[in-house]
């Protein structure tokens, strides 16, 4: 039972950190390449 409580307290924190860092990454990409439909480092 204690393990379940530990999981339920850790999972939201990790999820918040993950989505926060992902949002920050997307914001920075959109700041560097505004309105980009294709990114120059993905062109072949």
UniProtKB/Swiss-Prot annotation:
UniProt xrefs under InterPro entries: PSI_PsaJ, PSI_PsaJ_sf
Membrane-topology descriptor: Single-pass membrane protein
Pfam families, per the entry: PSI_PsaJ
Segments traversing the membrane: 7-27
Chief location: plastid
Record GO biological process: photosynthesis
Top-rank taxon: Eukaryota
Alphabetically ordered keywords of this record: Chloroplast, Membrane, Photosynthesis, Photosystem I, Plastid, Thylakoid, Transmembrane, Transmembrane helix
Subcellular location: Plastid, Chloroplast thylakoid membrane
GO cellular component: chloroplast thylakoid membrane; photosystem I
Function: May help in the organization of the PsaE and PsaF subunits.
PANTHER family membership: PHOTOSYSTEM I REACTION CENTER SUBUNIT IX, PTHR36082
HAMAP family for the chain: PSI_PsaJ (MF_00522)
Family: Belongs to the PsaJ family.
Protein name: Photosystem I reaction center subunit IX
Phylogenetic placement of the source organism: Eukaryota, Viridiplantae, Streptophyta, Embryophyta, Tracheophyta
């Amino acid at each position: 039972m204690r393990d379940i409580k530990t999981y339920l307290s850790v999972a939201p924190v990790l999820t918040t950190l993950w989505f926060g860092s992902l949002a920050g990454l997307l914001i920075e990409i959109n700041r560097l390449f505004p309105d980009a439909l294709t990114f120059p480092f993905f062109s072949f």
